[in-house]
A protein has these predicted regions:
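Bacterial N-terminal signal peptides
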Residues: 14-28
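Generic helix N-cap/helix-start motif at coil->alpha-helix transitions
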Residues: 60-68, 93-102, 117-119, 132-142, ...
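Bacterial N-terminal signal peptides that target proteins for export
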Residues: 2-18
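Alpha-helical repeat scaffolds
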Residues: 83-89, 116-128, 155-167, 191-203, ...
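Catalytic glycan-binding domains that act on GlcNAc-containing polysaccharides
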Residues: 94, 98, 103, 132, ...
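N-terminal leader/linker segments that initiate helical-solenoid repeat arrays
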Residues: 31-104, 111, 441-462, 471
Length: 707
């Protein structure tokens, strides 16, 4: 049944030329336009009166509702839907997505005529009518962004705030937050120091990176409060936003706050600046040296350290804590043995203050640097001094317990492990084992929803709309509707929703929803760890001589078993294979007639994916951790991380100190999944920690992958 459903979905994908964008693990992606093969929608929508187009008239008469919906979605994406008098008329009133058509039309009208009171009234009426539906949240959010400039120019910000207050999910949407900041900064004669610092801390946060409205806030704030400019410059440099940083630098130079020639040289050519002034660093302007030090961290960290040392006694507490925290952080993620020394120079408040771009990452990488060299006493101290919410995270709860055992306080360790031992996660399993408990969860007394509960939850309009979106390949919209539909559900209702999703072959929703329930009820193992495509996976895993449980564990993480998945970086299919990798695999397998679109075929994708896993094992010491890391980040990186080890490393320590957050989480999830799938096959392991094994930096790895 599952294979048939996926095949039907795949055919739908081809029919509508769907190209999915976004992270399938997080189930998010950018919005995209779709067209129906039977008409040239792009050409039709260029017409000032597309509704009179003969080809379109014929299409709208013959097409089914899903085809028409995809056309009007493209019209909306191209900002052309307002050219239709009443697009709703082309659909039956029972079409589940008809309100999206109406919302798009109203929003498009508001964009064309923001001062039209009738449109504003229609939108308000629509929002009242659909107050419990996600479409109202979406329209309200988009309407705010469409009208923000108009309301700001006419000083009608009370209307903006009134609409914003009614949002449930999106009050803190970066665009909305920054529009509010921009209005307040632009319309205040005097900006208090506290308000300026608060605004600066908001726009400097990573989630606001690259936001156009937030850039307007930055310019307005610097214009009103020039003293914020250098802080903003330092943050932008650390975030790698060089073009924006250069604009701020130019403002500082124009306002005579920095010497023009030296600061431009330090910013644009830091290596040249260092060569020019390395023998007279102490004579250079303090702020110019700070610019050079931050810019050099990504070019030559030793040169950056020398510049930082030249500033001893010149920096205030905030400047010192941020600069040495940055050096420690960059050193730690690059596995530099001096990282802890650099952190130490930042003092007790290292990584804190307005100049620190990534305070959370900075703090955690100090702990990872201690973990990497097994300085257990230091690690225990660092975790004990983390912010409480950070110290309670699964990884630090586990390593706090381990550190206490290693420094002779084993009796204190269980209190930390018990906080996470009920979880099916990587660290939940390690904590269970450390407590002497099984890291498997018995399914002898599992809880299931009743048929009545499943049928009842399936009548939820949001879940119905979500399913329709999934059926036509619109996963972003489907995920939003699904999350909206389950947002207020209790554990029993979530279980019913998960089983309803499973019943309708929405395995991605079944898994994600079941995860929310797993801590409350013992669930059927297959609900959390389904095994679709068994024949194909068994066949190609055996052919590649790899463990099919590993393949399932990886596929569950990569695509949640969505056959037509495409990530935001272009990885495709069940096993998320990059186009260049697919070509390389085809060449290795001597497939001369390979075409890129074949990677979406279930058999081809699994064949290629398992073959590639075999090649990674061949190259990377036949080590499951390294091969899994290599599948996500590339074999060259995995090999470099291995070879940079100062000594043989415990597998769990190696994984925790992988520099890339995505890869670190990926490896943990895939390996935890793998032993869960093995459990289904009665292939239990007695020790997760021993199963993870060790990573030997001196192990032989070949320089070329072969299948």
């Amino acid at each position: 049944m599952q294979c048939k459903t996926i095949l039907a979905y795949y055919l739908t994908v081809i029919r509508y030329s769907i190209f999915l964008l976004g992270s399938l693990f997080l189930c998010q992606s950018a919005s995209f336009a779709q067209s129906v093969d039977s008409i040239d929608s792009a050409k039709i929508l260029k017409s000032p009166a597309p509704e009179n187009n003969v080809e379109l008239i014929s299409f709208l008469q013959k097409a089914d509702d899903s085809e028409k919906f995809l056309f009007f979605r493209e019209a909306f994406e191209r900002q052309k839907i307002h050219l239709f008098k009443n697009p709703r008329q082309y659909f039956g009133e029972d079409f589940p997505l008809i309100d999206y058509i109406q919302a798009w039309f109203l929003l498009s009208q508001a964009r064309q005529q923001p001062n039209d009171l009738n449109t504003q009234k229609e939108i308000q009426n629509f929002l009242i009518k659909h107050k419990n539906d996600y479409i109202a949240e979406r329209l309200r959010t988009d309407w705010l962004l469409v009208m923000a400039s108009y309301w700001n120019e006419r000083n009608q910000w009370k209307t903006f705030n009134s609409v914003r207050k009614q949002l449930q999910w999106n009050k803190s949407d970066p665009n909305i937050v920054c529009w509010d900041l921009y209005h307040n900064i632009s319309n205040r004669k005097n900006i208090s120091k506290n308000f300026a610092n608060e605004a600066l801390s908001i726009i400097n946060a990573p989630r606001y990176k690259g936001n156009n409205i937030c850039q307007k806030v930055s310019s307005a704030l610097i214009n009103k409060v020039p003293s914020t400019a250098f802080t903003r410059l330092v943050i932008l440099i650390q975030q790698g936003r060089i073009s924006e940083a250069r604009n701020v630098l130019n403002v500082l130079i124009q306002k005579k706050r920095l010497p023009a020639r030296a600061s431009r040289l330090a910013f644009n050519s830091p290596a040249k600046w260092y060569r020019t002034y390395r023998n007279k660093l102490g004579t250079q302007n303090k702020h110019v040296r700070l610019i050079a030090a931050y810019r050099l961290t990504s070019i030559d960290i030793d040169q950056s350290v020398r510049v930082a040392n030249s500033l001893n006694g010149k920096l205030n507490k905030a400047e010192k804590s941020a600069l040495w925290g940055r050096l420690g952080y960059v050193g730690a993620i690059n596995h530099n043995p001096n990282a802890l020394q650099w952190y130490a120079k930042g003092g007790q408040s290292v990584c804190s203050g307005p100049y620190s771009a990534l305070p959370s990452d900075c703090i955690q990488w100090q702990a990872r640097a201690a973990l990497r060299i097994k300085d257990w006493k230091k690690l225990n101290h660092l975790i004990a001094n983390m912010p409480a919410s950070m110290a309670k995270q699964e990884n630090w709860a586990y390593w706090r317990g381990r550190a206490l055992v290693e420094i002779g306080h084993a009796e204190q360790a269980p209190q930390y492990w018990r906080t996470i031992s009920t979880k099916r996660t990587f660290y939940g399993k390690l904590a269970s084992e450390a407590l002497g408990q099984s890291f498997y969860y018995s399914d002898n007394e599992t809880v299931e929803a009743t048929h009545e509960a499943i049928d009842s939850i399936g009548k939820n309009p949001s879940l119905q709309r979500a399913k329709y979106f999934y059926d036509i390949g619109l996963f972003v919209e489907g995920n939003r509707e699904w999350q909206w539909g389950i947002r207020t559900m209790n554990a029993s209702e979530l279980l019913a929703a998960a089983q309803w999703a499973e019943k309708h072959s929405l395995l991605h929703r079944a898994i994600n929803t079941a995860i929310k329930v797993a801590e409350h009820y013992p669930l059927e193992h297959e609900l959390l760890y389904p095994r679709p495509f068994e024949d194909e996976i068994e066949e190609f895993s055996e052919k590649a001589e790899i463990d099919d449980n590993w393949v399932y564990g990886l596929m569950r993480q990569e695509s949640r078993f969505i056959a037509a998945a495409q990530s935001n970086v272009g990885a495709n299919g069940l096993m998320q294979i990059m186009p260049a990798t697919a070509k390389w695999i085809a060449k290795q397998l001597e497939i001369d007639d390979f075409k890129p679109e074949k990677i979406y075929e279930i058999e081809t994708n699994i064949y290629f994916g398992t073959s590639y896993l075999r090649s990674l094992l061949n190259r990377l010491d036949n080590n499951l951790i390294l091969a899994t890391a290599g599948y996500n980040a590339g074999p060259n990186r995995a090999s470099r991380w291995q070879q940079s080890l100062p000594q043989i490393s415990e597998g769990a320590i190696f994984i925790e100190t992988i520099p890339f957050t995505e890869t670190r989480n990926y490896v943990q999830n895939v390996l935890a999944n793998t032993i869960e799938y093995a459990y289904e096959q009665d292939q239990k392991i007695t020790s997760f920690r021993r199963w993870l094994g060790e990573i030997d930096p001196k192990a032989d790895t070949t320089t070329e992958e072969k299948i």
